[in-house]
Amino acid sequence: MQTNTTVVVASGRALLIDPAWLPDELGALAAELREREITVAEGFATHAHHDHVLWHPGFGDVPRWASSRTAELARTERDDLVAALGPDFTPDLIDLMGRVDAGTPAFDVELIVHDGHAPGHTAVWLPEPRVLVAGDMLSDVELPLPFWPHDVAAYERALDLLEPYADAARIVIPGHGNVGTDARARLDADRRYLADVRRTGRSDDPRRANAGMDAEYELLREILAATTDLS
């Protein structure tokens, strides 16, 4: 799994967004921040999936924020989130996972809350550098994934909400995939993919060739076929 962690630094203090993913990577990130004399001041989780609500003791006991729906799901779905972690996570990492509260970071950010990909999913806009931290959307390697409750319309509304930020962004950071300068092109590709499958039941999106994506493509076809006449 290719994952991205975003570290927003101001005057030696950091907002840590979606620290991930493996225990040794979390430990290495904590060590790197110490070496650079950067103190974690706050954390933020973009959504309540197990690889986005992680933490490490080396980051410190600081406020960890999320949207209200994400914070709620992190509590109510905790058993499933823990089960998804796997055997390499130690008890201290398991205990820290998902301990987020509803709130907004003190850093200069704008939160863009929607229900695409997951209920309460949140993108983070950094206005001065014009960076869009997109969570699990706008990926160059993953197809659009309208996960539980498989609400494709909510995903399409989320793309509409993200559009002005994608237009303004100099940099886009997806949860999985490569950092890029092509936020609007990625948004257009996601819209085209969903529209093609909705209209014809097919898509030739090149991301289908990436690991796990063809299965997600087939799932989307099933979801849309249940509500759309694809003949």
Task: Annotate each predicted stretch with a short phrase.
Residues 26-27, 31-104, 195-196:
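Active-site HxH/HxHxD metal-binding segment of metal-dependent hydrolases
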Residues 6, 17, 79-89, 185-193:
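Conserved N-terminal glycine/acidic-rich loop preference
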Residues 17-20, 41-51, 65-68, 113-116, ...:
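Active-site neighborhood of phospho(di)ester-bond hydrolases with catalytic His/Asp-centered motifs
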Residues 164-171, 178-231:
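Accessory terminal helices/loops
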